[in-house]
């Protein structure tokens, strides 16, 4: 039997400590990250206690009669303690569903945490989704990641890009100044897709100030001009490329290849995984960008799916 409590800001410290010690949480679930856009979502995060001990948390919000975990994050799902058992997890979902139903909610949409982000195996939730909730997969997105210790050889075109950028005098530097790169990124997204970055420059500067070791910018520079950059989200198991962009000149010179050479082959070579992120156009995972997927495969990347589940209460 679980005691289910709604999250409130006065327990942010307890929430954050739990996420940091959990077997599958990342800094995206820290309230310092989640709450930067709290004005856009009606928070409905849940905390699950048994015998006075916090055993799981669910980052979530509501819209209409639906609970989402979480539309404002790359992934959501149940964040679990190391000691949470499969039987407890199944009980948790039964009781959570009863609780949500009693509150007048009718549906749950659940973005599972991809397995590469787990510090320990943590798919008890997926078993419960199927056998307790009768959940269905309603979206399957496609991304690319590298198992770094596998040492897959880069394709020749990627290796040539590294050499070309070096010969052109491009250097790579880690920077705390996001403004120049954000202009490159914003111009590219606006020209190519007619969209803006998910985060504004001000938001990214705020998040970097809160998580300086987790949110890291690498820039490719020549003669003092930023030609491209990559923003990394660094979690215990995975280094994830949150944003990657280059100017027209930067693309011609191969600066993205040079940036990835520094990041993947040197600075973060000892990490378990590097995640390039998604290569699709639509929210349900359709519209595969074949050229983008091919580029990522050229660095030794291979496929991973990001699944979204749904069930009726």
Outline where the language-model segments fall.
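Short, well-ordered beta-to-alpha junction loops that form the rim of enzyme active sites
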Residues: 112-115, 278-279
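Conserved alpha/beta cores of soluble small-molecule-handling proteins
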Residues: 99, 105, 134-136
